[in-house]
UniProtKB/Swiss-Prot annotation:
Residue ranges constituting the Rap-GAP domain according to the UniProt record: 779-1048
SUPFAM superfamilies: Rap/Ran-GAP
Database matches in PROSITE patterns: RAPGAP (PS50085)
Gene designation per UniProt: rapgap1
Protein name (record): RapA guanosine triphosphatase-activating protein 1
Stretches that traverse the bilayer: none
Record organism: Dictyostelium discoideum
Amino acid sequence: MSIYHGIIGSSDHIQNIFPPPSPRKNISLSTNNISSLTTPKNFTAIVVTKPLSQSTTSTQEMMNTSDILFDIQQPLSPQHHSRQIQQQQHEKITPEEEERRSDELQKILLDTIPILIKGVETLGIEVEQICNGDSANEKRSNCQVLVDIQKTLREYPRGMGYRSKTIPSNIVGKPKLIAFRHSMDQLVWENISKLSILKDFVEFTLDFQKLCVIGISIRDAINSFVNNKCEYLIKGFEFNNTNSILSGINIHHHLNHQPGASTPRPSHSSSSSLSHSLSSSPMSQSLPSSLTSGGVSLLNTSDDAIVPSLSSGNDDSSGSSLSSSDANVISINISTVIQNGVRDEINNTSISALKKSQKQQPVVLSRAPKQVMESTRILVDTVVNRKCMYREEKASIYREMMNDRLTLLKEDPKKFKQQLLQQRRQKLTNSDQPHETDYNEDFNLNNNSTNNNNNIKKESNGSSVNSQTTTTTTTTNNNNNNISPQHSGTSGSPSDKENSPIFSPGYLSTSPPKSPPKSPEFLGVPIGKKAHLLGHARSFSADTHATKEAAANQHHHSHNNIGSVLSPPLSSQNERILRNYKLLSSSPSSSSSAVVTNPVSLTTQLQQQQQQQQQQQTTSQPTQPPPSEYQLLDLEWEEPIDSDFILPCKGYKIDSGNSKCQQVNYDELIVLYTDEDEYHYCDDFCSLEHFNFLGVNKNQPDNPMCISVVVQHDTNELLYIIRTGEKDEKYRLSLPYGKKEISSKDMLKMIKKSRFNQMSNFKLKEVKSDQNQQFIKQLIQFEAKNIHKTFKFGVLYCSENQGTDENELYSNSSTSDEFQEFLRILGDRVQLQGWTKYRGGLDIKDNTTGTHSIYKKWRDFEIMYHVAPMIPCRAADEQSVERKRHLGNDIVLIIYKEGNTKLFDPSIIKSNFNHIFAVVQKVDPIPNVDGAAVINLGNSFNNNNSSNNNNNNNNNNNNNNNSDSNLPTTNNLPIITNVNYKISIGCKEEVQNFGPAFPKNHIFSTSTGENLTDFLLTRLINGERATLKSPVFAQKLKRTRKEFLHSFITDFGSE
């Protein structure tokens, strides 16, 4: 197992998690002489004590009966250090030992996390007592604990369902205090939610390394109480002032731990048990030391003075005089002991009392509902895996670059601005040339440093980056650039983790995942809060910069210019944002620099501006692949010379197949306009603090507008959704560098400046905070109504000699067996009474629209068929009003036609809603001269639906029984049992052409029933979506959108 290193404070202080043994210089002194010592820089004290019994009552007695061994650690040479790493890489433990330690650590965590949750709940109760500025100052340490815990658990996901607490009457009229109370209430909920989710994750996890990562986070959370002197709130630990002494103590097993040696589980507090588990296993060496060096460790509790005794077999290789089996080694920071003094007593609470107090703690369950707990565990597993693979060596390169930049900014701001301006001018001048800059240009503005960093090359054995950086970079395999789709995300299984290139050492950690599925109830907007702070979430890291650069220049930059550091893959959310949100300039093109210092020709200046705009357009949106041959054929409908089933008539188009198409490409059955099926507002805005604005055009009062804006921390951008009467527009704006705070008014000014021509005459007002919750729910419903993922298709039965009278088609109540077989291809027969899924307007209570219907769940869509013969109709009703009430409001009609005497005339359909007509007819198979049946197209495609295969077999058997006498049995012709269909598509002329295309006179076989279903549903869904884009429906949708927006302005935008 490799050892990771952490950079503590600066790059010249490196601390290993487990320091290798080194020669010691032991000096025995008494405790009374401690105050007169001056501690060297590389100085450590070793206190050798005997195991303390419960009768030990004071720290003073412990120190007086102890001997102090001062240890001067000799610095290790690089060769010695590399040998130590190689030795520890070969250390392994048996699977049984690892399983035992995992079980032990899991039990300790399950005992510790509820105590932390109870402590946070107690903090929430104390925060509720704040009623004025003085009481807020008194509770400052309690509030700081909440902030520190939130920072510790920032990367972990939270639950959903947050509700703001009511404001007490004694703070009404104090907006700052109200906002403060809301922030603290949200922190209490968020910390409890994350701790509860971690507890749930620990219950289902036995991976020791993952448990260690979570244990370190829990240790840091406990340190938040200790550092702010609020340890009395954690009742399960019974802290006292002894922590001020123990705050400088770190327990290390300097004794050589043999692989596979069992470590007895101590029967002390869960804190000391957790510390022993975290520090005694070689598995924990894979954790970065930056995670284990957070001030006071979880070892620093009152019971940590009692170290579990090691077996005597582990004392032989210690290299010191400590040979007794009951000896314990405690490394003490002498300066901390001298500063704090030995003045407190150690808590001697019995173990039974501790367990009793732990059992009394209430179990706090996760705030996330049960149906999303599995996805929540996956998010936690992603965070833990990222922490395990994080390497400080890679990030230290960027840290040095950032330090140089900040140093230059502090020393000479004027020079800093001049160099920045010079670089920007150089980029504009070279905008017509390929990009040759790399990440160093954005981070280091010092010319010398930039030149040095630009010349970094890949080295197989590692090389020094510069004189101030001690971290080395390793060679990365170029094949890692190609990441397969199945490896684009993290998986919880160890095999996926090992095989995935994302977990290779060349990759940095990705940005933290978002919370579980968003809830409309979680608003996250404190009442009265007008500003959004960015500084607390923008800690610089290499992966943040790499993500931003990859998003902006992924088609133009080569990532090999930064040595061996590769940019991490974009998260799925960032990819979706990059694909759907158009990048805008922070200032309009007309407001470009009007002052020209150098008399350059106006033509040259305009050319540079045009090149810059073209570059921005190409880099802001991913390039779309060119349409395939099949997609081009979808838009080419040939005029039928002789239509098979549909009678050509005025006002209608017919597609009976394309002569240029050779076969149906089932791999490219693409549904149109799927980019409009995403819930952008619900996914990107609802779970974050955001602002909403409403207004109308001053010159055109009938033109309303609604704007939502949120801050995207990962990319340091503002995301906008602009809703007008016509459509939703999605944009993103980059925030200026160094912008620490931005108000809602500034957000609105930025988008108005970028979209000046569109928004110059709009008067927009922010939705009030007390109405924002209800308004967000309205926006979620508004977005859901504009997403079209449920369909209702009508099905008519056309018997022989029918097709010229609409009432004849609607009056058919008895059907043939072939029609029933065709219905089984369309979907499943379901009972309507008690139906819980999409019902398509049918009655599911009283069976007034029939007892059964046909339903299909296909991809992400739901289809309910309105089968006319299955809907009850009175015999005396010649118009079949009950059936027309449903089928007449369907855009798509499927007509199953029998016989060849008459063609279907689409002009007989009187409904204005029916626009798409799919006529399907059964045809007899035509055998070849060789004696083989018609080519079965399904043989070249995989059909994985076993149930459909069984249904097809049953259908074939029924056909054998019913039509054996009609099959040819002479002339050596084979018996053919497959049923074949031919399809013709018709639509009104105002509907644009749609696909997928199919060959002329193509025959679909029942042996490929699922493929026939895929083709037919794709064609019909595309037809309905194309119809909604037609002028008639587009005008209705536009009018409906405007009515909704005007109602929002009336209800939420008034004074």
